[in-house]
């Protein structure tokens, strides 16, 4: 296959645009934090939250404030059954752990759970038939 010069220029421009050299801000939270029934994967552009049988994607980067506090604002959970449920996570980074308030709001109301997630630990979804896996 031979590309004409205009096609080659267009393809090169597209590739350069897609290879955005994004540099996350200083202090950006990265890595995996996990615990019982939950896992957070912080990247420079997105945060993936995995819960039993569902999860959510939040926009990144996440930069905790001077106290280590951050908020992952309310977003719809993934999956047909969970799509009417909103997930919000309010966290505090303390050393290698995140102390998180996990807020779920749906047709039945709002519930809040407290979770402690540890850096470098994957979420433990054992015992559940619909255990989440990394994409």
Residue spans for each PLM region:
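N-terminal glycine/threonine-rich, aromatic-flanked beta-hairpin/loop signature
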Residues: 35-78
């Amino acid at each position: 296959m031979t590309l004409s010069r205009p096609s080659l220029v267009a393809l090169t421009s597209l590739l350069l645009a897609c290879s955005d050299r994004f540099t996350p801000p200083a202090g950006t939270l990265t890595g995996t934090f996990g615990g019982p029934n939950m896992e957070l994967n912080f990247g420079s552009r997105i945060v993936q939250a995995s819960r039993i049988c569902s999860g959510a994607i939040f926009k990144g980067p996440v930069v905790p404030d001077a106290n280590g506090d951050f908020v992952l604002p309310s977003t719809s959970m993934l999956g047909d059954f969970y799509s009417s449920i909103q997930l919000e996570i309010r966290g505090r980074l303390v050393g290698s752990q995140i102390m998180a308030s996990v807020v779920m709001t749906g047709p039945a109301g709002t519930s809040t759970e407290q979770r402690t997630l540890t850096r470098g630990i994957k979420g433990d979804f054992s015992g559940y038939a619909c255990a989440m896996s990394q994409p």
